[in-house]
Design a protein with these regions (language model features):
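Bacterial Sec-dependent N-terminal signal peptides
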Residues: 1-23
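Residue-level hotspots at or immediately adjacent to binding/recognition sites across diverse folds
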Residues: 22-340
Length: 340
């Protein structure tokens, strides 16, 4: 009986240890760039983008990296990137003029596929449902969010409402979108191959928007530095939104909300992430990872409870589209890998 009890205790300890046994391995650091764009194509192919016109690429799982400065865009901030293979990627420069560039030769040459010099234009994030269909969102122009879509892998971009802004939601004063990790918007194909999606705002008000509806998110809001930063959805259409207050990044108040009905109702986690978080992703249907300037958290129960695994600062985290590898990136050119 005693031996059975000892075995049970041993197995319990082993389970508890393995439940949150993840760690972070820093692969790159020291490059003068703040990385907020990250796209992991496979376990081997990773692209990243950031300030000072910088793009990074690895084709061997992060063992070696090629660092590029995009010619004529040396002072631009590429806040998001979408890569399709080792040669093809799209990068997004945020401020006036808003610019989207594309490469087909691994970053050696880039060409312009979109430009908008409208006063106040500021692009925040991109999302792709597949290799052809994507959407970009930007801060409001005259109270209306800027949205553009592509159906040809970013070669051309179009206005989905064809100038009829009455079809777009009206944003409150001080409500906008954070360009913190390129993940406050998502589009995907449902089981019937129908295009679905949504995006989350922050600032004075924080809401989640679908094509026809919008819902207030029960998160901290009311200041320009508060609200939703990132939204993720799994194959069961379970959704999670993270954010907080980036000026008080250890404050965990109102930094996470979960929904299983596209934002109609939200619940708060039982144990929240440990501070402001700028990005969240699903590793699998129940396991998630979130990161921010005050650390990294893991959840093994769909986002209800979070465990701090590192106090290292990162802006963005992404999993391989085709594979299992998870990478993170942040300031000072830091790129890391999650060790499961």
């Amino acid at each position: 009986m005693k031996s059975i009890k000892s075995i049970f205790i041993f197995l319990l300890m082993l389970f508890c240890r393995n439940s949150f046994s993840q760690s972070i391995e820093v692969l790159q650091s020291g490059t003068k760039t703040s990385i907020r764009g990250l796209s992991v194509v496979t376990d081997k192919i990773i692209w990243a983008s950031g300030s000072n016109g910088t793009v990074a690429r690895s084709t061997d799982g992060g063992n070696t990296w090629q660092w590029l400065i995009v010619k004529d865009f040396e002072k631009r901030d590429f806040r998001d990137i979408e890569a399709f293979d080792s040669n093809t990627a799209i990068i997004m420069a945020v401020a006036e003029p808003a610019v989207i560039l594309k490469t087909k030769d691994g970053g050696k040459n880039w060409y312009k596929v979109f430009e908008d010099s409208t006063k106040g234009m500021f692009l925040d994030a991109m999302s792709f449902a597949d290799e052809e269909t994507g959407m970009v969102i930007g801060d409001p122009i005259k109270t209306k969010p800027f949205i553009a879509m592509t159906v040809d892998q970013g070669e051309t971009w179009m206005d989905p409402v064809r100038g009829d802004t009455s079809k777009l939601p009206t944003l409150f004063s001080g409500e906008a979108f954070f360009a913190s990790s390129g993940t406050n918007i998502f589009i995907k194909r449902d089981a019937d191959y129908k295009l679905i999606g949504g995006f989350a705002s922050g600032g004075m008000k924080s809401r989640f928007f679908t094509e026809k509806e919008n819902f207030f998110i029960p998160m901290i809001q009311g200041k320009e530095s508060t609200g939703a930063n990132s939204v993720a959805i799994n194959n069961n259409n379970e959704m999670i939104i993270v954010g907080g207050d980036f000026t008080n990044d250890t404050n965990a108040t109102g930094n996470c909300a979960l929904s299983n009905n596209f934002g109609k109702t939200f619940i708060k986690p039982q144990t929240a992430p440990h501070g402001y978080r700028s990005c969240v992703i699903y590793i699998n249907e129940k396991q998630l990872i979130t990161c921010g300037t005050s650390g990294i958290d893991i959840s093994n129960d769909g986002g209800l409870n979070w465990k701090l695994i590192s106090t290292e600062s990162f802006h963005v985290v992404q999993k391989a589209k085709k594979g299992n590898a998870v990478f993170l990136a942040g300031s000072n050119g830091r790129i890391a890998k999650l060790i499961l």
